[in-house]
């Protein structure tokens, strides 16, 4: 036997030993606190106006510097992020499954005040939001006993009840930062008006358990606060201060309520979250950490809104040991061991708007999720935009003669991924 042969044989044995000793499955996973999104590089291009972030309980327009930053962010948008966040959302696009079999639910974001055409503004997107069940965030009271309003700093809203007449939805989320704009009587009256029109509600005193095609789905909704109101509502609005960056946010009540919803028979858990810093293209890693904790507590779908701009989407693998967590992969291990996937839409953007520009503010998405066999089987998205005189929500594809909307449509293709876009 030659020396070369001996060396080759030894090398093969060493490599075989190394492969045999390499960690596999969960043994290959890094410690959670030592990997993305807990570990990341700060945005090197972070503009100063990001210091104009507001948390809902501390609006203070007497602070001139902070107010100036806030207005600058409104005009320019925070478009960059951590390098790892950007890379992550680019890489996850290829792992998002297209809409599949099972129960299909559609979601839209913030239904904000409009100036006219209240009863018919949504006629053009009835087919776009079509699904087995349709959900929206009603970000304004509709109390007939209070004046119509949309002013102040921060603004207080109240819309005509006719706004509810033409809504193509089955469930409205009522808890967000504008829930208390006309007080307890106003939010209670809003709920009555919604129910009177045959829609269901969630987020005011109770969460919703609904049956869709013989499948029980729990819709639990939470808001990160009210707009700096000193009064305390007598209603339960399910407030969780999601925006306290750097703090260990207490999600124990949410976990208890998820468990209780499952005890009631929910086969899927959908969380509707009014959260996130306004006018920012990407979620802060803080919110990505929270979302992973919620998925670990049992969430199958997380639907976010509040930033008034569309943010990226990801699918999380639950109890898939071959899916190692990190940049480009959301993966979670839970004690029940049941393999599944969960969907996270960080922000759907606006559904309606009365601010005529920029295109990011006037454009949101209809998000869709398909559920079957205890799993998320697929996702889809369709962009929608607001037109004026009269106010009308239309498919963005019908607005492509407008260069701003055409540009925004292309940006969303890149931001979300075109492969799972729906017409």
Identify the meaning behind each predicted range:
Residues 25-102, 261, 334-336, 356-423:
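A short C-terminal boundary segment appended to hydrolase-like catalytic domains
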Residues 26-175, 181-183, 190:
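N-terminal catalytic scaffold of extracellular/periplasmic and nuclease hydrolases
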Residues 114-116, 142-145, 177-191, 203-204, ...:
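Active-site environment of divalent metal-dependent phosphoester hydrolases
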Residues 119-122, 213-269, 399-402:
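Binuclear metal-dependent hydrolase catalytic cores centered on His/Asp/Glu-rich metal-binding motifs
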Residues 133-144, 176, 257-282:
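Short acidic, glycine-rich surface-loop motifs adjacent to enzyme active sites
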Residues 145-166, 267-300:
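Active-site-proximal segments of metal-dependent phosphoesterases and phosphodiesterases across multiple
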Residues 169-171, 283-365:
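Conserved beta-sheet core of the metallophosphoesterase superfamily
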